[in-house]
Amino acid sequence: MDVSDVTSRYNDRLRVTDYADAATNGLQVGPGDRSVERIAFAVDAAAATISDAVEWGADLLVVHHGVAWGGLDAVTGREYDRIAALVDGECALYAAHLPLDGHPELGNAAHVADVLGLTQRSPFGDHSGEQIGLQGQLPDPTSAPALSKSLAAALPTGDQPVQVLDVGPAELTDVAVVTGSGADWLREAEANGVDALVTGEGKGKLYHEAREAGVSVFLAGHYATETGGVRALEAVADDWGVETRFISHPTGL
């Protein structure tokens, strides 16, 4: 198996060409004909995760947040350092951003939905015609504090509490999920009649918008809500006869 084989398999599974994305989805760094025996997985292609991948001897690093956003006009500074570390370490880089957010089985939103036990799921979070989230029903009506505890227990939030804007119904049933920075989908949540929106991080105007919409919002951390997708890709690769390793590097954000 070489880098092109891995790239093709993930590209097809995630439908990477169907998404309008600021990120470059697919192979970002490295030759396609390099043999792959070890694949490392991480949320972010940062200096720390690249260093860990190279030290382990990874032939390929698979991430959610890569190094190419809207094209690369210049490769200098920290961008140069990251790419140089990959090239010098003979480690290719594959990234899947929005396609990994919204995949109904492998995606970040699907992982959070699994954590919450959501049933009757349907696509949510329209982004240029593709859906990057999910909505569904909780197994039982749940209070905001109880839902917050469930998220904190199941996601790698570290010492950071799940922030809760408890401005919706006292008992929550219908929940929408857009991981990472998903506060912009509050209006869609309101339009769909859900009781709560689970995402990673918010914006200053979110409190009043959520309060006026009557939709509770749970901010569980950008990193914490987006580990599930790359872990799912790791599980897929485990069946390919290669060594895999997840590099955990929580940001607390």
Swiss-Prot record:
Keywords: Metal-binding. A divalent metal cation 2 binds at residues 65, 222, 226. GO terms for cellular component: cytoplasm. It comes from the Archaea. A divalent metal cation 1 binds at residues 64, 101, 226. The keyword Flavoprotein does not apply. GO terms for molecular function: metal ion binding. Signal peptide: none annotated. Belongs to the GTP cyclohydrolase I type 2/NIF3 family. Homohexamer. This is GTP cyclohydrolase 1 type 2 homolog.
